[in-house]
Curated annotation (Swiss-Prot):
Organism of origin: Rhodospirillum rubrum (strain ATCC 11170 / ATH 1.1.1 / DSM 467 / LMG 4362 / NCIMB 8255 / S1)
Homology family: Belongs to the universal ribosomal protein uS13 family.
One Gene Ontology term, aspect cellular component: cytosol
GO molecular function annotation: rRNA binding; structural constituent of ribosome; tRNA binding
Gene name as annotated: rpsM
Stated name of the protein: Small ribosomal subunit protein uS13
Pfam families in the record: Ribosomal_S13
Region annotated Disordered, chain positions: 95-122
Oligomeric and partner information: Part of the 30S ribosomal subunit. Forms a loose heterodimer with protein S19. Forms two bridges to the 50S subunit in the 70S ribosome.
UniProt record, GO biological process: translation
PROSITE patterns: RIBOSOMAL_S13_1, RIBOSOMAL_S13_2
Protein role: Located at the top of the head of the 30S subunit, it contacts several helices of the 16S rRNA. In the 70S ribosome it contacts the 23S rRNA (bridge B1a) and protein L5 of the 50S subunit (bridge B1b), connecting the 2 subunits; these bridges are implicated in subunit movement. Contacts the tRNAs in the A and P-sites.
Length: 122
């Protein structure tokens, strides 16, 4: 099991799939990384040499924002919007959908489980 960007990469999977276990790297970026390091996408992680793992690690560390740094940046962006007091920030604060979805019905994922209202019956 190789360790890249603080994540244990599963050794029995193909390289392009295994790299997606890192937060911030999807299928497209994983394909780019494999192409730039000269590693075939269909090779398994346990078939990689230590040198190839080091090359992957260097590219990810130098050029991509992943894991903790990316999570921190996303959280800071949301916090900045909330501090501005703009409409999107208010929606984040209230725990409602931010991107214009309807809330009269639906939006249960964002709002949480339904809260019963006393005296309300049909």
């Amino acid at each position: 099991m190789a360790r890249i960007a603080g994540v244990n990469i599963p050794s029995n999977k193909r390289v392009c799939i295994a790299l997606t276990y890192i937060y911030g790297i999807g299928r497209t970026k994983a394909g780019e990384i494999c192409e730039r390091t000269g590693i075939a996408e269909n090779r398994r992680v346990n078939d990689l040499s230590d040198d190839e793992v080091v090359r992957i690690r260097e590219i990810i560390d130098s050029e991509y924002k992943v894991e903790g740094d990316l999570r921190r940046e996303v959280a800071m962006n949301i916090k900045r919007i909330m501090d501005l007091g703009c409409y999107r920030g208010l929606r984040h604060r209230k725990g409602l959908p931010v991107r214009g979805q309807r809330t009269h019905t639906n939006a249960r994922t964002r709002k949480g489980p339904a809260k019963p209202i006393a005296g309300k019956k049909k």
